[in-house]
Amino acid sequence: MIRGIGIDIVHVGRIRHWSTVPGLVERFFHPAEIEAAVSRGSSKDLSLAARFAAKEAFGKACGTGLAEMKLKDIYVRNERSGRPVIILEGTAEKRFAELGGGIIHCSLTHEGENAVAMVLIEDTQST
């Protein structure tokens, strides 16, 4: 059963600006996300924009926003196939468990200067 759906869009210029403010990228992104984005070269900001959109979409899918969660405790990594997977640590893992947990599905895309993420949370309890 679907427990929640969230979607978000982020303009890449927002992330480009954050890159000029010391410590801001590190505040919002997990080190693994930053490393993966840097490895993408000129697509770095687009990669981070998609990942930030995923964090926001996850909060919306939870139905609570990102209250009580640190953004860097929610991160996206890609499987070998390229499929994005949301990983939770620390505050995000704890809060998600308090909300009942579930299976998290994520899709990322981009067009021009915009990155979009959709997150679906599937209930693991049968009804």
Residue ranges and their predicted role:
Residues 1-127:
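Core catalytic alpha/beta fold that binds nucleotide/phospho-ligands
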